[in-house]
Amino acid sequence: MLNSVYDAQKSDCNKALNALKRDFSTLRTGKVSVKILENIFVDYYDNQTPLNQVATVLATDATTISVTPWEKSMLKGIESAIAAANIGVNPTNDGESVKLFFPPMTTEQRKENAKKAKAMGEKAKVSIRNIRKDANDGVKKLEKDKSISEDEAKKAYDEVQKITDNFIEKIDEAVKNKEEELLKV
């Protein structure tokens, strides 16, 4: 019975940790990542379609992304969608593909992204604490239903707290690593 509470808590905490890592991928480091274009949608035959489903998106070097559409007629639409996304660069259409040239990041931008990473970490910690509350409620329900004794409940609360502390540590480590990566020139 308690194992199902622990398993659900661990599963939910892993989801929160993975969501944090996904959020981190949207932060620009010293080199560009194609993930910055992940949330851009293009009008494709009257449907809003993810950019990566209508074009090949490649990071050609540390500061350039190339977007080559599978249909040449898509060039203008892709260029407009990227411009409208307001990601901090102006797309350049060379007739074959759309190129994005990212300027090197300033120290100020790096510090700003490090702050964002810290805020994302805090948000993830709040999620972990809410998951702990749900797990504790599950233990409380089992105790109320007389499925477990008071001593077992006490041990269960301690185990729930251990799991929470473990995931908070993992989040702190992930934030620390991301901050180091962001601030490294």
From Swiss-Prot:
Gene Ontology cellular component annotations, sorted alphabetically: cytosol
For this UniProt entry, what is the primary localization, expressed as one broad class?
cytoplasm
Which residue windows are transmembrane per the record? none
Query: Which Gene3D superfamilies does the record associate with it?
Result: 3.30.1360.40, Ribosome-recycling factor (1.10.132.20)
Residue ranges annotated as coiled coil are none
The listed locations are: Cytoplasm
Indicate the family of this protein. Answer: Belongs to the RRF family.
What is the name of this protein?
Answer: Ribosome-recycling factor
Query: Could you tell me the gene encoding this protein?
Result: frr
